[in-house]
Amino acid sequence: MASQGTKRSYEQMETGGERQDATEIRASVGRMIGGIGRFYIQMCTELKLSDYEGRLIQNSITIERMVLSAFDERRNKYLEEHPSVGKDPKKTGGPIYRRIDGKWMRELILYDKEEIRRVWRQANNGEDATAGLTHIMIWHSNLNDATYQRTRALVRTGMDPRMCSLMQGSTLPRRSGAAGAAVKGVGTMNMELIRMIKRGINDRNFWRGENGRRTRIAYERMCNILKGKFQTAAQKAMMDQVRESRNPGNAEIEDLIFLARSALILRGSVAHKSCLPACVYGLAVASGHDFEREGYSLVGIDPFKLLQNSQVFSLIRPNENPAHKSQLVWMACHSAAFEDLRVSGFIRGKKVIPRGKLSTRGVQIASNENVETMDSSTLELRSRYWAIRTRSGGNTNQQKASAGQISVQPTFSVQRNLPFERATVMAAFIGNNEGRTSDMRTEIIRMMESAKPEDLSFQGRGVFELSDEKATNPIVPSFDMNNEGSYFFGDNAEEYDN
């Protein structure tokens, strides 16, 4: 692990800032959050949304998607060059839900992208404020992570669907920058690389010419990002080997799949940030909260405090359970889709149940669903304790684990042993003799085999009372180690479809 001295903190990545001290970081993250809030308030005014409608998470998501679309330069350019029937490249929109005569109604709105860019810049002191856009992307990514399984995508790239704990950020757009790269899981980076190598195998010109040179630079950069997530020398050395390959092919794909499996036990470091829906920031700004003056951190108590007193609503389909919908959104808000359920449940102060047992579908409503039969209910997003978000995968040891997901990726810096069954993971290595046998592989397998069940595999700080803002009195929760900790265990969650 590179020493902290050479790494920019997340908040610096998030705000594109150079080295800053803690106060400056808190202020610049606060400025970013305040900008999102001001933008949201202005959009609600332009759309004439009532206070209640402005607190509806589905409306928040539509407004967020509109601003992301307005700033998606590559797509905008593509749309202008390839006009498709019935799609105006200069406009963006989506469903807005309004409460009319005691019923919810859907209204499809269309806006000039230019107009939305104007509102966004105005809310952000005239700047493009890309950090705020990335923040919104990460919130959408965290929501997808909590809602969908990526089984199909995993299988397509030759990985095991049980490796879903490595897939954080798999739906983040490419343009999400350093802050986006920080939150991507090992499996996500892996998959991007495998897709790239496969294209190279199928398309002779992929690595050639001027374009090929750019492709190569992107390939090496992605390799370096993935290498930076691994915590052991042998895993890093294997990544060097993949990066330096003259002509990446099947051997590299095998190495990458091997590394992804190894990450189930020798976990990578992946950042976690609490990114909340724009309407939450809007509510706070509207009530007079000055984020820039107060400062804000995505990895501390601030998001917990914000959620303690924000009332957000959601549309609920006739057979959905509002409490389950709340759990889904709570997990998304704290980037906790791959966290151990026992830890999440302790912090939330309510039992957190696996995805397969939730009676709820995604938050977004498809255009063919009938909204008039839907009710709205308050999302319960409060917590009993708070904990610092971690960027470390923790040191590892062995535990009984499930068929559905054979590892977790810790979100909260809380001490516990991590559930995984060594036999299950090691079985994934049997009979795979393709790729190169090398000292590195042997070394990695040796480390995995010697991972001990007794060790506390994740040394964290513990959780804190919400009154303990300075994190002075850690409470170390005790967990029933026989209980299952995986969210996607034995699951039938929907697949994510673009």
Curated annotation (Swiss-Prot):
Homomultimerizes to form the nucleocapsid. May bind host exportin-1/XPO1. Binds to viral genomic RNA. Protein-RNA contacts are mediated by a combination of electrostatic interactions between positively charged residues and the phosphate backbone and planar interactions between aromatic side chains and bases. HAMAP family: INFV_NCAP (MF_04070). A motif (Bipartite nuclear localization signal) lies at residues 198-216. The lineage of its organism: Viruses, Riboviria, Orthornavirae, Negarnaviricota, Polyploviricotina. It holds the Pfam family Flu_NP. InterPro entries: Flu_NP. GO terms for cellular component: helical viral capsid; host cell; host cell nucleus; ribonucleoprotein complex; viral nucleocapsid. Residues 8-22 have a biased composition (Basic and acidic residues). One of its GO terms (molecular function) is RNA binding. SUPFAM superfamilies: flu NP-like. The gene is NP. Residues 1-22 are annotated as: Disordered. This is Nucleoprotein. It comes from the Viruses. Its main location: virion. It is found in: Virion; Host nucleus. Belongs to the influenza viruses nucleoprotein family. Keywords: Capsid protein, Helical capsid protein, Host nucleus, Host-virus interaction, Ribonucleoprotein, RNA-binding, Viral nucleoprotein, Viral penetration into host nucleus, Virion, Virus entry into host cell. Late in virus-infected cells, may be cleaved from a 56-kDa protein to a 53-kDa protein by a cellular caspase. This cleavage might be a marker for the onset of apoptosis in infected cells or have a specific function in virus host interaction. Encapsidates the negative strand viral RNA, protecting it from nucleases. The encapsidated genomic RNA is termed the ribonucleoprotein (RNP) and serves as template for transcription and replication. The RNP needs to be localized in the host nucleus to start an infectious cycle, but is too large to diffuse through the nuclear pore complex. NP comprises at least 2 nuclear localization signals that are responsible for the active RNP import into the nucleus through cellular importin alpha/beta pathway.
